[in-house]
A protein has these predicted regions:
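Loop-to-helix entry region of an early transmembrane alpha helix in multi-pass inner-membrane enzymes
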Residues: 80, 84-96, 105-128, 161-165, ...
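Hydrophobic/aromatic-rich transmembrane helices and adjacent perimembrane loops
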Residues: 363, 397, 402, 407-441, ...
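Membrane-embedded helix bundles of polyisoprenyl
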Residues: 27-33, 70-77, 118-136, 141-189, ...
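Membrane-interface helix-loop-helix junctions at transmembrane boundaries of multi-pass membrane enzymes
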Residues: 191-192, 235-241, 292-300, 364-397
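Extracytoplasmic
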Residues: 3-8, 27, 47, 52, ...
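Start-transfer (signal-anchor) and selected internal transmembrane alpha helices
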Residues: 1-39, 50, 144, 282-308, ...
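Transmembrane signal-anchor helices characteristic of membrane glycosylation enzymes that use polyprenol
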Residues: 14-52, 57, 64-70, 74, ...
């Protein structure tokens, strides 16, 4: 055939036309992925979201100080006054890999710019890796389809676009590469080649675990695959050493890393690998010593006993429970009683509408893929033609089932559903085309009918695949991935570029003492530390719950009580007691700080309440507001808030602090009551309500009614030259706009240490 036409020879390798076609398709997929992921550059070349700023700062530390210093780094600029052990609480491989590659490929470029492009490059390189993986499963055609689908998949692009210097792009690259090496190693027994691939596969999976915690969601289907393997393959002499080799290497290498280390080995991840591996070894031995007639029966009995034993281990509590987010992934109906967990936007439960928007027509081809896989399984049992071996078939199905199931818990887990559906849909589409062409060749009565069927089918498939890329307008997959970096609009609901945050952080860095402690909501901690170079109390790592709860409490106190707590020294700082972030241990150590003589004998709940009331020793308070000016320059300035800043997050402040929302908010859970305006946060908002507007007719009313929107006018309560507890020292530019349009205002107050309360 033409595709096998030999073009030239390199050594023993014959380069044929089909190889050129593969390179062309992969190059196209890589280029398309790069272009879609880079659309954010139209708004500005910045890191996106929050975590990437910490990752940039950690990478910069390695570049400047070396890897050894990184593993000894206790960051005293965050989580004041406790600090943070960076290597124990971070994605180590992300930082080490980026720093290493920067030294090789940086070529004098700025590290900040290098980290902005890093996720785009590795996210696009993953199209090649998923091609290789799916090719092992179901052939070259399926692999090429998977590469093209991966290049345009919305959930994958959203978590790997320009500036998304987080763990997912590198983690996905590593885990897909590790799985490819593992499955290509066990597909056939090739001796030393299989040995090398299995070892390398385990190594890259460990890299993925260290770079991205989400890799653990790939471990569960892998463990289930190990359980099924003795029933799927007859080459027990091979798998009895190949699988333990992978598992042993994985566990051993995991222990070398500070994270995940023993927490993975002794937790559900390690159990999901170790116990199925032990089962596989014993099951293979049982089959070896059993007669042919009793092999299946004895193996099934042992499987049942193993499952019951596993349930008993879990029920006994011998295996520690994972964190809530992993439990919630296994049980999507599990409700969180932690307001802090619920407040994270990435923890929003996935809706059917979101799933269909993210997966779109891929679901159609994934369903076709499932049908063909089950049909293939039937063919295997009947010794008919098959396109995928039983063991690969089972892993594909396990990954798909677990991926789609887990994605129903959190919206961020749509990433796993997307990868699962991509694999299934690429397999389904490749087999569909193969059967379609074969059937038309065998059944068509004449060439014209053949051609019509082929052309019509290809046209329909192309139209289906094109729909999510072009429809609907402005919210299709291509346009949806085009948005400004979070720091350019503050994470507000407005698709604008104001630059208020970069301006504010540069002002902070230039106009405040280097040892200043900035009190703010935890969302902004990474920005303040990395760009503003100032000390913060909390950030997106959410390491210490009671620290964030304390921040919420202070925001909702009256100005005098808030000022007093903000200016008081922190007892942990005075005593020099190193407190851990582990809740139980941390509370026990705090009891020694708060009650060194053990006279009070209070329990954990009272201890936590007392921690929340301890001093903070801050110097500045930062708040962020987002809203809309609704009048032009010829009219008095009126505003509507609720644009995604602290004015919108106040309901979460209240819940996290444990207060009653009815005390501070109206029935719509947004509009403030008078009690809110007496809090520190309320008084720091430089606006006052002048009435309540009806969006349907633009009328203004004096009293609140449900459905009305508060209308604000400027009103600064803490002027810069005042003698109150706080002094306004900075307001970002957009708040001064004179025309209609959005504002994304960063406001900074200096804490007046000389303030005298009025009795």
């Amino acid at each position: 055939m033409t595709k096998n036409l030999k073009l030239f020879t390199v050594g023993n390798f014959e380069f044929r036309l089909q190889h050129l076609l593969i390179i062309a398709v992969l190059s196209l997929a890589f280029s398309v992925s790069m272009l879609i992921r880079s659309q954010g550059a139209d708004y500005g070349f910045e890191l996106n979201e929050f975590d990437p700023f910490f990752n940039y700062r950690a990478t910069e530390f390695i570049v400047d100080n070396g890897v050894d210093a990184y593993f000894e780094w206790h960051d005293d600029r965050s989580w004041y006054p406790y600090g943070r052990n960076v290597s124990e609480t971070s994605q180590v491989m992300l930082h080490v890999t980026t720093a290493s590659l920067y030294k090789i490929f940086g070529m004098g470029s700025d590290l900040y710019d290098f980290t902005i492009m890093f996720p785009v490059v590795f996210g696009s390189l993953s199209v090649i890796v998923i091609f290789a993986l799916v090719r092992v499963f179901a052939g070259t055609t399926a692999g090429l389809f998977s590469a093209m689908f991966f290049a345009v998949s919305l959930p994958i692009i959203l978590r790997g676009g320009l500036g998304w210097f987080k763990s997912e792009p590198l983690g996905i690259f590593f885990v897909l590469l590790g799985l490819y090496l593992f499955f290509s190693g066990i597909k056939y027994n090739k001796g030393s080649i299989s040995f090398a691939k299995i070892i390398s596969g385990a190594l890259f999976v460990v890299f993925a675990l260290s770079a991205w915690g989400g890799t653990q969601f790939f471990i569960v289907p892998l463990g289930l695959f190990f359980l099924a393997l003795p029933f799927l393959r007859n080459d027990h002499k091979f798998i009895i050493w190949a699988i333990p080799l992978f598992s042993f290497t994985l566990i051993l290498l995991t222990l070398i890393f500070e994270r995940p280390s023993t927490s993975f080995v002794l937790g559900y991840g390690g159990v999901a690998i170790i116990l199925p591996t032990v089962f596989l070894i014993i099951c293979c031995l049982i089959k070896k010593i059993s007669s042919v007639e009793k092999q299946l029966r004895n193996s099934v009995i042992f499987l049942g006993a193993s499952v019951l034993g596993g349930i008993a281990l879990i029920s006994s509590g011998f295996i520690p429970l994972p964190t809530f987010r992993y439990q919630n992934a296994v049980n999507p109906f599990l409700l969180s009683e932690n307001a802090l967990t619920d407040s994270v936007s990435e923890h929003v439960t996935t809706t059917l509408e979101t799933s269909f928007q993210f997966l779109s027509v891929f679901l159609i081809f994934a369903a076709i893929g499932i049908w063909f896989i089950f049909n293939n399984f039937r063919n295997n049992t009947q010794n008919k033609e098959k396109f995928i071996t039983n063991d690969m078939l089972v892993f594909v199905l396990l990954t798909a089932i677990f991926g789609v199931y887990a994605s129903s818990a959190f919206i961020r887990l749509e990433l796993f559903a997307s990868i699962s559906v991509i694999i299934l849909s690429s397999i389904g589409l490749s087999i569909l085309i193969k059967h379609l062409f074969n059937n038309t060749q065998n059944n068509a009565r004449n060439n014209s009918v053949k051609s019509l069927i082929k052309i019509s089918s290809i046209f329909v498939i192309i139209c289906l695949l094109t729909i999510p890329l072009v429809l609907p307008q402005d919210t299709n997959w291509v346009d949806y991935a085009k948005y400004p970096a979070t720091i350019l609009n503050g994470g507000s609901s407005y698709n604008v570029v104001h630059g208020d945050w970069p301006h504010a952080l540069n002002w902070m860095k230039s106009n405040t003492p280097s040892d200043s402690v900035v009190f703010s909501w935890w969302d902004y901690g990474y920005w303040i530390t990395a760009i503003g170079d100032r000390i913060t109390l909390a950030d997106n790592a959410t390491l210490i719950d009671h620290q964030i709860e304390k921040i919420a409490h202070v925001f909702l106190k009256n100005e005098d009580d808030a000022w007093l707590q903000l200016t008081k020294p922190n007892p942990a700082q005075l005593i020099g007691h190193e407190l851990r972030t582990n809740t139980e241990t941390g509370l026990d150590e705090w009891k020694l700080v708060l009650d060194p003589n053990g006279r009070m004998g209070y329990g954990p709940e009272i201890t936590e309440e007392m921690i929340i009331e301890t001093g903070i020793d801050a110097d500045y308070v930062l708040i962020f507001l987002a809203g809309m000016r609704i009048t032009d320059s010829n009219s008095p300035p009126y505003y509507i808030l609720e644009g995604g800043g602290d004015e919108s997050k106040k309901s979460w402040f209240i819940r996290i602090a444990g207060y009653d929302e009815d005390k501070f908010l109206q029935s719509d859970v947004h509009t403030p009551k008078s009690a809110f305006w007496n809090t520190m946060l309320g008084k720091m908002i430089p606006f006052t309500i002048v009435g309540y507007g009806d969006p349907t007719n633009d009328k203004i009313y004096n009293d609140y009614q449900f459905g009305l929107v508060p209308v604000y006018t400027p009103d600064v309560k803490y002027p810069g030259n005042g003698d109150g507890p706080f002094r306004l020292v900075y307001v970002s530019p957009s708040i001064d706009r004179t025309e209609k349009g959005p504002i994304t205002a960063v406001i900074i107050y200096e804490i007046n240490k000389d303030y005298k309360k009025l009795n």
